[in-house]
Amino acid sequence: MSASSSTADLRNRILFTIFILAVYRFGTFVPLPGIDPAQLKIMMDGNQKGLLGMFNVFAGGAVSRMAIFALGIMPYISSSIIVQLLTGVSDYFKNLKAQGETGRAKITQITRYGTVALATLQGYGLSVGLESSADLVINPGASFKITTVTTIVAGTMFLMWLGEQITQRGIGNGISLIIFAGIVAEIPRALVTTFELGRTGAVSTFMILVLFVLLILTILFIVFMERALRKILINYPKRQMGNKMYGGESSHLPLKINQAGVIPAIFASALLLLPVTFSNFSFSNNETFLNLSSYFTQGQPLYMLLYASGIIFFTFFYTSITFNPTETADNLRKYGGFVPGIRPGESTALYIENILTKLTTIGALYLTLVCLMPEFLIANYPIPFYLGGTSILIVVVVAIDTVTQIQTRLMSSQYEQLIKKTKFGK
């Protein structure tokens, strides 16, 4: 493949990704049939805080507009969480994972079935909740429920398909980019609201400046932590083949501090959001539920405790299923590599695992700090929820990963062209 064709392929992938994200954004403005928009606005104006506010941000504002993508990609993420957990404890799923490409295809299919089931359940709960709100549904009844469930399930599955298309034919991880696009689309409204709070005197100008300084520092901190590596020195012995000596070189095994990326924050959020997707509507007039839901708002100890626990758990869990120290040690021994001062095999695996555990601990604390520190500000000042730490983390990490993929493809294209020039030069 020539440099020009490689560049054209990259350009086409980027344009394809932008097109798919534009289709997604269009879908967030297509309303569910049978909803009174005026009554919906009145209801949503009083339900923009807490977990429902976070869910609305992740869905790109589709919840506040009660669009066909109102559930966003969360049913798929929730299904993925369940399947990933089963992979760690179930022999059946462990065997599927060990079967390679065939097993992964089967796991993907099971995840899709789980997505349909969750979207159906949540769609039905949503339809019941909408009907319980006075004058919100124009013609309540079985017809509305069937239409809503069908539309919600179709919208969720279409959104999942869009994400898969981005991953296969575009740039970056499709599911992450859809969440990224939803958050970015809500940022302008958050900025306008923040400046309006300053203009009216609800928040001092000094506090707004402090907020933006903290925002910049948080972004820089995230970039630093995502780029940070712990390099393990790997040596290769010299080997004589004929009259020549080969090998004797050194390399490094790079381990990221945050091996799990943004997945723990997304999974922890999805776990908290799972019961909220319809309960805010279904029990909106229930006093017990209202008292219980008050504990799941910004700054509340129970909310932050559950969120922090979820982030820490999924950081360790996801790292354990994506990086296997024993497998890495076996591959090193197979190719003659060794860590200086450490015996090949089991000792090397234990050494790598020990380092990985320390790095994962730091990574879990870093993710928890970034996601929860802004919650203290949100709890004490009238700052829009869209500027929460989780939103910032997802935007920055997904942007870094996407730019890295683009750079990798460009470098690969340049390297291929250099090799061809070298061959022609000979």
Which residues does each predicted region cover?
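N-terminal cationic and glycine-rich segments that engage phosphates or anionic surfaces
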Residues: M1-K97, T102-K426
